[in-house]
Amino acid sequence: MSYLLWLTVPSKTLILTAFLLLLAFTTIPVGSMIWWATTANEPKDLGYVEIREYEGIDLSSITAFRENSIRGPQHIDTEDYRLTVTGLVNNELEYTYDDVISNYPVFEKVVTLHCVEGWSVTILWEGILVKDLIEAAGVDPNATVVIFYAYDGYSTSVPLDYIINNNIIMAYKMNGVVLPPERGFPFQLVAESKWGYKWIKWITTIELSDNEDYLGFWERRGYPNDADFQ
């Protein structure tokens, strides 16, 4: 009679019964078994792997840069970070980090940075168009200059036409890796065809202006304001 009753028990019940018996007689704590089950397939952080070649172009390493910022690398918390678009605009805008990287088309460019110190690096930059950010604010017709301000107090400017006509991007990745703090996280201007002092890092404010005589940090110290690389 017992044998017949056993055969009629649903298979799921049999599996559950066997599992409970295993728990009853094993020396492995239940907590340990649950931990193994929930962590076995979790991803392991193996660190970043940067891209070193793109469409046949050899790329420089992220580590090839030299540190020449005015106050050293800045460490910015994305929870507190805000990017402001202000000045000669119809509507001043304030973005969070996620606003910027989630709400605008993303573009990639291989661009070489040339430093006045005599070194250069060729990097695959990934980011959003500056013109998309400022056009969302509504650019005043009188605006001719875009001034960028950084978290460390640095600033520089470029012509508005340069931003628009060259599809200049504000990068948040380089060689497929999110910008590290020393490289300008959360955002760096990719000022192609300009010397490196125009490649402002740790951007916090973008101001539209009609002040074509504005001089940034190095420009006030004698560097050419156009900064065109020849």
Where are these regions (language model features)?
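Stable alpha-helical elements in mature extracytoplasmic
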Residues: 81, 93-96, 126-129, 133, ...
